[in-house]
């Protein structure tokens, strides 16, 4: 008996120019997270997702898309913008991890101070955040 595996197509395809991707393109499993850095459920899922990535290795392609829910999380959009600023410097995943590991420090003054202390954003990057977020397909909710 030759069982075939079900194949699924993503409604919104993964695009390297827009998405933040970890893992090989040819991985048998693609997991797309629409995440909000201030969401407590996303924060609780973060270590679980890290463990899944660790266990699956090259069998998983993980894709993160910023999805700040501003109606519930007033600091989520600025946190996502900081992640995009870090992305412009090739350091998205470092900032991504930092934001989830320090969810209690997402207020503007903490966010910019931490980002600059970590060397993730420059003053120029902070000024062009709205443009960068639009170019990366930043999902905004209001």
Where are the model-predicted features located?
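Residue-level preference for long, well-ordered alpha-helices that form the structural scaffold
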Residues: 41, 131-134
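Non-globular targeting/processing and membrane-anchoring segments
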Residues: 1-32, 115-117, 121-127, 134, ...
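Structural alpha/beta surface segment adjacent to cysteine/selenocysteine redox centers
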Residues: 32-33, 37-116, 121
């Amino acid at each position: 008996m030759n069982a075939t595996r079900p194949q699924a197509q993503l409604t919104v395809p993964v695009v390297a120019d827009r998405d933040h991707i970890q893992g090989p393109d040819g991985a048998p499993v693609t997991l797309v997270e629409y995440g909000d850095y201030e969401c407590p459920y996303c924060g609780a899922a973060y270590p679980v997702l890290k463990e899944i990535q660790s266990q699956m290795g090259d069998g998983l392609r993980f894709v993160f898309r910023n999805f700040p829910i501003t109606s519930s999380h007033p600091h989520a959009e600025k946190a996502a913008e900081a992640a995009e600023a870090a992305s412009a410097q090739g350091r998205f995943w470092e900032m991504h991890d930092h934001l989830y590991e320090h969810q209690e420090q997402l207020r503007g003054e903490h966010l910019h101070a931490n980002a600059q202390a970590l060397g993730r954003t420059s003053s120029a990057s902070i000024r062009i955040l709205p443009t960068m977020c639009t170019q990366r397909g930043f999902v905004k909710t209001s």
